A protein has these predicted regions:
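Short N-proximal segments of mature Sec-exported proteins
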Residues: 26-56
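Low-complexity intrinsically disordered segments
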Residues: 81-189
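Alpha-helical ligand/cofactor-binding cores
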Residues: 69-86
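Sec-dependent N-terminal signal peptides
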Residues: 4-14
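Compositionally biased, intrinsically disordered low-complexity segments enriched in polar/Pro/Gly
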Residues: 21-24, 90
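Active-site-surrounding "flap" and adjacent substrate/cofactor-binding loops of secreted or lumenal enzymes
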Residues: 52-74
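Sec/Tat signal peptide C-region and signal peptidase I cleavage site
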Residues: 14-22
Length: 189
């Protein structure tokens, strides 16, 4: 069921918004990148064509975290959602037009809250720092964050995504050296 919904979503994004595009016209610029970002961040198996869309999406940063989330959401909303998929086509795969609209809006909102990509490569770069003081001497300790962000969990649980979350295989202890090792891995590694 998830794959058929993801397939219809892909078809929907490839299709045009009848209010903004004419038949056969391709999406370009940020509109194209926004649609690609939604599709690429909805699955863990990503082709190389995803790099520019994901890079563009995560390059959107504001001074305040809530402003970053809103700016990323606005970027994702550039992707047309009035995709002209008729009720009969949606009914064939067991969803109605309201479910399709709510599912797409929910997916875009979920993606907009991602602080970074949910891949082992990104998770291994998320380092926590702690200052420990004892007898007037302080030192800084480090570790790679051992917890998966809630946004990654929400994305994996969304009905329209096919996400295999990485697993943590590291030591949760704090170290004096800045971590250069990996602790997050794909489950099949």
């Amino acid at each position: 069921m998830r794959k058929s919904i993801l397939s219809i979503l892909a078809i929907a994004f490839i299709a045009q918004d009848t209010n903004a595009y004419t038949l056969g016209e391709e999406l370009t610029g940020d509109t194209k990148l926004a649609c690609e970002a939604v599709l690429c961040l909805s699955t863990t198996s990503r082709p190389s064509e995803c790099k520019s869309a994901i890079k563009r999406y995560f390059s959107i940063k504001m001074r305040k975290p809530h402003k970053t989330i809103q700016a990323r959401l606005n970027f994702l909303k550039l992707c047309p959602t009035n995709v002209g998929v008729d009720k009969e086509t949606l009914a064939k795969i067991g969803i109605d037009e309201y479910e399709q609209a709510n599912g797409l809006n929910g997916l875009v909102t979920t993606i907009s809250t991602l602080p970074y990509d949910c891949t082992p490569e990104s998770l291994n770069k998320q380092v926590e720092r702690r200052r420990v003081c004892q007898d007037k001497e302080c030192e800084t300790l480090y570790r790679i964050k051992p917890t998966l962000p809630k946004a990654c969990q929400n994305l994996a649980q969304h009905q329209w995504t096919i996400i295999q979350l990485p697993e943590y295989r590291g030591d949760r202890s704090w170290n004096k050296e800045y971590p250069t090792y990996k602790v997050w891995f794909n489950k099949d590694q």
